[in-house]
């Protein structure tokens, strides 16, 4: 929504998910840019959503600049609830091109791949926006989001943007009220909700559990890739390149002292930054690296090893004519990366050309 900063009155609003039952909120700050549409400069807002949609609206009036038609979605809500018949789907989107199937299930061994396939067929799944159920519903993209709080980075001069979407399925299971899952919050309770277990949802007929769809070994049941780095052309609002980012080096059950030579495409928390030199920087992935890429074609230019998880967005600054890139390497508890309290800065050598 947009508010008049002087009066506080609502100027316009746009709903990206109708009757949200999946935790598909808008996770990150929107990004403002001026783009050229039919030869005219249009002030727009880019709003990345957990669904993978990027909604592009004229920020002066809230009208869509990139179409987002309403399309039919799965029906059949839990008892006492409802689902809308349609949801908006932006034409600028990273959402999966096809629904998951049993053939997409994956594992580090034949055993956990088989278990993942069995679990997949036990869940309700009819594609994106399948309603939550007592049976258990596969939510894909998962409620962690294809986009999270890192958002996207826009280079207004080159009219390009950088995005780092990910694709991890989750399982949503409705828990009927009963012992340990009361309708109302107990009077002596101190707060509500945790990162794991039943989310109480006081006042409605069900609690809910939301968990990543993992194999017995703790790996995603969906085959890789799980994370990408991508470039968008803001003149056309099209995706021009997309590449896997991140290795399993720091997610293995045993230490890997040397770099893993292949990009699997890892889950991420954090965002990219773009610089005037046509270079983007990003950490975020579940392996402990800060990386630099060519913004035009996605070529990896450099990577530096971090002492802990880089689940943060880098920043850049200049001192005495020299540019630095800095990242907070603190790790992330629920993400499983190495914890720390480091601030790490990088710069080119003084004799670099």
Set out the residue ranges of the language-model regions.
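Beta-sheet-rich non-transmembrane sensory/scaffold domains
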Residues: 1-353
């Amino acid at each position: 929504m947009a508010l008049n900063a002087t009066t506080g009155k609502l100027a316009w609003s746009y709903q990206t998910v109708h009757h949200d039952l999946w935790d598909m909120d808008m996770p990150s700050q929107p990004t403002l840019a001026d783009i050229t549409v039919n030869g005219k400069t249009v002030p727009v807002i880019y709003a990345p959503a957990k669904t993978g949609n990027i909604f592009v609206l004229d920020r002066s009036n809230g009208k869509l600049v990139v179409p987002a038609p309403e399309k039919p979605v799965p029906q059949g809500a839990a008892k006492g609830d409802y689902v809308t018949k349609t949801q908006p789907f932006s034409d600028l989107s990273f959402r999966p091109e096809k629904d998951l199937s049993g053939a997409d299930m994956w594992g580090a061994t034949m055993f956990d791949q088989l278990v993942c396939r069995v679990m997949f067929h036990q869940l309700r799944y009819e594609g994106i926006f399948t309603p939550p159920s007592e049976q258990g519903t596969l939510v894909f993209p998962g409620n962690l989001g294809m986009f999270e709080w890192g958002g996207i980075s826009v280079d207004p001069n080159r009219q390009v943007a950088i995005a780092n979407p990910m694709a991890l399925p989750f399982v949503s299971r409705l828990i009927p009220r009963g012992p340990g899952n009361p309708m109302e919050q107990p009077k002596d309770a101190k707060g509500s909700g945790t990162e794991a277990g039943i989310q109480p949802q006081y006042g409605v007929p069900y609690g809910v559990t939301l968990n990543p769809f993992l194999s017995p070994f703790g790996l995603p049941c969906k085959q890789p890739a799980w994370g990408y780095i991508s470039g968008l052309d803001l003149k056309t609002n099209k995706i021009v390149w997309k590449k896997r980012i991140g290795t399993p080096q720091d997610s293995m059950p045993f230490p890997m002292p040397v770099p893993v030579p292949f990009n699997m495409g890892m889950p991420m928390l954090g965002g990219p930054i773009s610089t005037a030199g046509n270079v983007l920087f990003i950490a975020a992935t579940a392996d402990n690296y800060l990386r630099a890429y060519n913004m035009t074609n996605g070529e990896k230019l450099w990577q530096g090893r971090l002492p802990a998880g880089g689940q943060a967005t880098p920043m850049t600054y200049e001192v005495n004519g020299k540019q630095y890139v800095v990242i907070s390497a603190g790790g992330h508890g629920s993400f499983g990366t190495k914890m720390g309290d480091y601030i790490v800065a990088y710069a080119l050598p003084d004799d670099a050309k």
